[in-house]
Regions:
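Transmembrane alpha-helical segments of multi-pass small-molecule transport proteins
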Residues: 118, 146-174, 188-199, 229-240, ...
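C-terminal membrane-solvent junction of multi-pass transporters and transport-like membrane proteins
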Residues: 189, 342, 382-469
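Transmembrane helix-loop boundary segments of multi-pass membrane transporters
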Residues: 63-74, 145-156, 177-186, 289-298, ...
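Membrane-water interface regions at transmembrane-helix termini and the short interhelical loops
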Residues: 64-66, 92, 108, 116, ...
Length: 500
């Protein structure tokens, strides 16, 4: 068996991952000698970019849904906490596998079943990319309109989106180290600007009582706001492996998890609470958060708000989304031989048209609500199943076997049944189906939502249902690590000894 090492074209120690240079590694296993990241970097990577309009809008929606300040505050707090716990479930995996979360998911779902994770994460990455590009473009045109009276029409918006996509593409092309350093720089700046939001809008703040609830009554609307808040940290779960794969396998999983959890929770929570606080000053415009915050902000805050909230943090998040999509595409059979940065450039062109279609030609808020509902109902059970598998195998993986899809004729530990773990797929499907039965949105109402007085429990039920079915199914079939095929590393060792 020749060239078993995934990414053998780049020898150990020869991969490039420097600030300002194009990263040469893809989804191949990162050699130990190249794993120079520290666990604390997960904090800065997932804290810094949260203070962008595309992420903050998830907090402003709590006010837009009709909640008062304190109800919105607690919905955001509870949602952020629970969503961050789901994020925590997949945080320790990538340092053990040396690759991203989508490829790592093959341990639970099978080497072919990993494509389920690819589909879910592509949906998330492209969805957020669209949101972030659109809100950055809005920030530009509304700020320039306030300063110079320029147009806010479709032409100006289209030009602004094109500019944002080009800048975003540069970050995604450069890759891991450049993105990590950028997020590190944003961390301190984001804390300062985030706190300035409270100062800038304090004179106009009022703890509005709410009452005009989007879903008719308080609790269904409160849970919708909590679900929206939870979706933000959950949406980052598939991305954590992009950065964790450069952390040494010897790093403590508890330390890795603690830094990741702290970064995602504090970043999402503070950004969304700040957005909700500001939105009380323009509650009637809260659905159009970018326009509302730009037009009602005091003059002294317009420039830092544009540079950090509208551009730097938003573009950093968008670049991370595009990087994730391009990195994962390298594991698709038709794109095995295409370089990551080539894929990133191609995706940028596609997203420009997609952004126009989804947010300009149609209703942005309706599409956003649909996106959140589908994303959280499908991603939560996927992440919970991966987390349970990690606990069952006690963090022990066979990294080479995860790359069997790239080795002709190879199977390995994670082959299961034809490359798919049926137990995991059934569990995920059961979780999604159960979750949709409890869904309560303006677009879709599940048949069981009336049993909980209209409260949307879709993502909670999806995660619980999928996790329970997977745990029971795995224990019953007694296949905690996977199938009966020998590890590829053992096969390689036998071949070497046989030719010696």
């Amino acid at each position: 068996m020749k060239n078993l090492e995934a990414g053998a074209a780049i020898g150990a120690g020869l991969g490039k991952d420097d600030f300002g240079r194009i990263e040469t590694r893809g989804i191949d296993i990162i050699p130990d000698v190249e794993r120079k990241s520290k666990p604390y970097e997960l904090f800065t990577v997932f804290f810094g970019p949260q203070f962008g309009y595309g992420n903050m809008i998830f907090g402003a929606l709590a006010i837009a849904f009709g909640l008062g300040w304190w109800a919105a505050f607690w919905a955001i707090t509870v949602g952020s906490l629970v969503g961050s716990l789901v994020f925590l479930a997949v945080t320790p995996i990538s340092p053990k596998t040396g690759t991203n979360n989508q490829v790592s998911s093959g341990a639970a779902f099978g080497v072919r079943g990993r494509l389920l994770g690819s589909g879910i994460t592509w949906f998330i990455a492209m969805g957020f990319f669209v949101i972030l590009v659109y809100t950055s473009a809005q920030a530009l045109i509304y700020t320039f309109n306030r300063w110079f009276g320029t147009s806010t029409g479709l032409g100006a918006l289209s030009i602004a989106m094109a500019v944002i996509i080009v800048v975003t593409c540069v970050g995604a092309v450069l890759g891991h180290r450049s993105l990590e350093r950028g997020d590190r720089a944003l961390t301190i700046v984001s804390i300062i600007v985030g706190l300035l939001v409270f100062i800038a809008f304090a004179p106009k703040f009022h703890a509005i009582p709410g009452g005009h609830y989007l879903l008719g009554t308080f609790w269904p609307t409160w849970f919708l706001a909590a679900t929206t808040a939870a979706s933000l940290p959950i949406s980052w779960g598939p991305f954590v492996g992009d950065y964790g794969r450069y952390i040494p396998a010897s790093a403590s999983p508890r330390v890795v998890g603690a830094y990741g959890f702290a970064g995602i929770f504090l970043g999402c929570w503070l950004a969304m609470v700040a957005a909700a606080f500001a939105a009380t000053a323009f509650a009637a415009q809260a659905f159009n958060f970018v326009q509302g915050i730009t037009t009602t902000s005091p003059a002294w805050f317009v420039l830092p708000m544009l540079l950090i909230l509208g551009l730097a943090s938003n573009i950093a998040s968008a670049a991370m989304s595009l990087y994730n999509a391009a990195l994962d595409a390298g594991a698709w059979p038709i794109l095995y031989k295409v370089k990551r940065w080539h894929i990133a450039v191609g995706l940028s062109a596609i997203v420009l048209g997609l952004t126009y279609l989804l947010v300009v030609a149609t209703n942005f808020i309706t599409n956003l609500e649909s996106f959140v509902t589908i994303m959280i109902a499908t991603a939560t059970p996927w992440m919970v199943i991966m987390g349970i598998h990690y606990l069952l195998v006690k963090g022990q993986y066979a990294p080479l076997d995860l790359h069997a899809f790239a080795i002709p004729g190879a199977r390995g530990r994670y082959w299961y049944t034809g490359g798919i773990n049926i137990v995991a797929f059934v569990a995920w499907g059961c979780g999604v189906a159960l979750g949709l039965m409890f869904s309560t949105t303006t677009l879709f109402t599940g048949p069981l939502e009336s049993s909980v007085q209209g409260v949307d429990l879709s993502w909670l039920m999806a995660g619980l249902g999928g996790g329970i079915v997977y745990l029971i199914g795995t224990l019953v079939t007694a296949r905690r690590t996977a199938g009966t095929q020998p590890d590829l590393a053992d096969v390689a060792a036998q071949e070497v000894s046989g030719t010696a």
